[in-house]
């Protein structure tokens, strides 16, 4: 085999209080095709020219896996068919890292486990919250122990509906991290630990009220929302519907989770009239299948 296409789901990280720990795979995808060539060299298509060099994340993780296998990097053509918007808090970077790692592994006979691929990509990304659900699918919680990620899947009630509100502007993760404090109070740490536990149980039980209350956070959202125009107006509107609400990852995408149908229609009636930017509403569901060959 000298050609493979990997499909990776979008992911939403944090889910409110689960900062750098919780993640969930969603029904939006990026496909990346890797084709080895006889000639040494790199050709990347399907993305902006600025991402066609050797620092492309899919190529970087592809090379990292080959290096871990003590395999030379041959010539390769990479085509990216991305439907996950860039710098919107939906795991676009993680999708490329996962695709590159899995693509290289498949082309070398699947010699590394999924955990091995997660170890390599986590060393590149720095946190496993998006990577874990991209690899494993579903709802995950992760920690880093002695430098290595440890991930578990959690059950999800089948009745949840997700609605992503995606703005017409981006927010680089580096900027979203730069506004966070270096230290937090003990009270805020306890607040997030307790609320995070409630989020996981609420998602399992299908308890919308518990989820709505549990998704409150004191570690990152209050700082990041200042970077997102319309945040407080949209949050207030969503609260009137009874849906749970949080930042998707570092933002700027906002995520609504509900068990009641018709949320998109309810928001559509008022969203444009209260916001300065254009917000795309994208209904999604949980994707229980992680990255795989197509």
Each model region followed by its residue ranges:
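Glycine-rich beta-alpha junction loops
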Residues: 28, 38, 138, 166-171, ...
């Amino acid at each position: 085999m000298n050609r493979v296409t990997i499909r990776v789901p979008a992911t939403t990280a944090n889910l409110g209080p689960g900062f750098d720990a919780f993640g969930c795979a969603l029904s939006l995808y990026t496909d990346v095709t890797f084709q080895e060539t006889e000639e040494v060299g790199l050709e990347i298509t399907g993305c902006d020219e600025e991402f066609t060099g050797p620092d492309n994340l899919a190529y970087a993780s592809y090379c990292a896996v080959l290096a871990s296998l003590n395999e030379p990097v041959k010539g390769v053509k990479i085509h990216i068919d991305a439907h996950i918007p860039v710098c919107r808090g939906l795991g676009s970077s993680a999708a490329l890292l996962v695709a590159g790692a899995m693509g290289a592994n498949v082309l070398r006979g699947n010699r590394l486990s999924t955990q091995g691929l997660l170890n390599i990509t986590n060393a590149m990304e720095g946190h496993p919250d998006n990577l874990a659900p991209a690899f494993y699918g579903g709802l995950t919680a992760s920690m880093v122990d002695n430098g290595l990620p440890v991930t578990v899947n959690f059950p999800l009630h089948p009745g949840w509906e997700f609605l992503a509100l995606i703005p017409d502007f981006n927010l680089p993760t580096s900027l979203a991290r730069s506004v966070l404090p270096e230290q937090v109070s003990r009270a805020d740490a306890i607040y997030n630990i307790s609320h995070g536990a409630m989020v996981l149980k609420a998602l399992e039980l299908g308890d919308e009220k518990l989820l709505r209350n549990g998704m409150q956070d004191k570690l990152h959202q209050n700082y990041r929302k200042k970077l997102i125009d319309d945040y407080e107006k949209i949050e207030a509107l969503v609260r009137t519907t009874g849906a749970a609400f949080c930042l998707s990852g570092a933002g700027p995408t906002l995520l609504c989770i509900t068990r009641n149908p018709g949320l998109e229609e309810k928001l559509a009636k008022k969203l444009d009239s209260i916001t300065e930017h254009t917000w795309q509403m994208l209904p999604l569901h949980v994707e229980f299948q992680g990255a795989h060959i197509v």
